[in-house]
Amino acid sequence: MLTLKKSMLLLFFLGMVSLSLANSKRADEEGEDKRADEEGEDKRADEEGEDKRADEEGEEKRKRFLGGILNTITGLLG
């Protein structure tokens, strides 16, 4: 009976150690996934910011171009 208790205690201990290691490994992987997601979000935000800036610059160029054309046309007409 004593050897059975020792064996059961040993199995319980080894199972708890294994479970603890598995939980810590899973937590590490989740942390890495969160960091990767955050980095991906940062990159997307940077890309969106660049897109907005490019759109604004394009809009300014169009306004300048149209303004130049209108000035030329009014100069020719009047």
Swiss-Prot record:
Kinase keyword on record: no
Biased composition (Basic and acidic residues): 25-60
GO biological process: defense response to bacterium; defense response to fungus; killing of cells of another organism
Annotated tissue distribution: Expressed by the skin glands.
Signal sequence bounds: 1-22
Propiece residues: 23-64
Ranges for region Disordered: 24-60
Transmembrane segments: none
Residues with PTM Leucine amide: L77
One Gene Ontology term, aspect cellular component: extracellular region
Key words of the record: Amidation, Amphibian defense peptide, Antibiotic, Antimicrobial, Cleavage on pair of basic residues, Fungicide, Secreted, Signal
S-S pairs: none
Pfam families referenced in this protein's UniProt entry, alphabetically: FSAP_sig_propep
InterPro entries: Frog_antimicrobial_propeptide
Top-level taxonomic group: Eukaryota
Cellular location(s): Secreted
Function recorded in the entry: Antimicrobial peptide. Active against the Gram-positive bacterium S.aureus (MIC=30 uM) and the yeast C.albicans (MIC=100 uM). Not effective against the Gram-negative bacterium E.coli at concentrations up to 250 uM. Lacks ability to induce contraction of smooth muscle in isolated guinea pig urinary bladder. Elicits histamine release from rat peritoneal mast cells.
Record family assignment: Belongs to the frog skin active peptide (FSAP) family. Brevinin subfamily.
Full protein name: Kassorin-S
Organism from which the protein derives: Kassina senegalensis
